[in-house]
């Protein structure tokens, strides 16, 4: 059976592994998931990620990041635009997560961007997820 929402699956795996204090989490890979992982890394939510090419399919492995006393770097993750209800935002009406403390991941014509990058470039798009 095919997966209906691979992005929601990725975010759920990250949330569950983070809550269980795992060091890494693996999942099936795609270009979109790798781009989301790149944004999470550049924003400091994960330590690193790698795409491993197996015989069957590619695997994306995220190395989760914790503070000195095992404090989570990711407090929460929420899927916004879903297959049944797409959510779009104009460049003038981009969402801010927790007043700018979190990150909104937006799919634009310039690729995947954070809310701050999309505001700088003046582009809108589909709001995929919030991370804080």
Swiss-Prot record:
Keyword flag RNA-binding: yes
Keywords: Ribonucleoprotein, Ribosomal protein, RNA-binding, rRNA-binding
Molecular functions (GO terms): rRNA binding; structural constituent of ribosome
UniProt xrefs under InterPro entries: Ribosomal_uS8, Ribosomal_uS8_sf
GO cellular component terms, A-Z: ribonucleoprotein complex; ribosome
SUPFAM superfamilies, A to Z: Ribosomal protein S8
Keyword Signal assigned: no
BP GO annotations: translation
Family, similarity comment: Belongs to the universal ribosomal protein uS8 family.
PANTHER family assigned: 40S RIBOSOMAL PROTEIN S15A (PTHR11758)
Subunit structure: Part of the 30S ribosomal subunit. Contacts proteins S5 and S12.
HAMAP family from the UniProt entry: Ribosomal_uS8_B
Stated role: One of the primary rRNA binding proteins, it binds directly to 16S rRNA central domain where it helps coordinate assembly of the platform of the 30S subunit.
Stated name of the protein: Small ribosomal subunit protein uS8
Organism this protein belongs to: Corynebacterium diphtheriae (strain ATCC 700971 / NCTC 13129 / Biotype gravis)
Gene: rpsH
């Amino acid at each position: 059976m095919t997966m209906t929402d691979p992005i929601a699956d990725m975010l759920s795996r990250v949330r569950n592994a983070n809550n269980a204090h795992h060091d890494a989490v693996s999942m099936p890979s795609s270009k979109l998931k790798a781009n989301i992982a790149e944004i999470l890394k550049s924003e400091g939510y994960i330590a690193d990620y790698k795409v491993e090419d197996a015989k069957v399919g590619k695997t994306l492995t995220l190395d989760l990041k914790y503070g000195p006393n095992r404090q989570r770097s990711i407090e929460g993750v929420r899927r916004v635009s879903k297959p049944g209800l797409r959510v779009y935002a104009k460049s003038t009406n981009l969402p801010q997560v927790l007043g700018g403390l979190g990150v909104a991941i937006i799919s634009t014509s310039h690729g995947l961007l954070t809310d701050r990058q999309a505001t700088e470039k003046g582009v809108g798009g589909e709001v995929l997820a919030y991370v804080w």
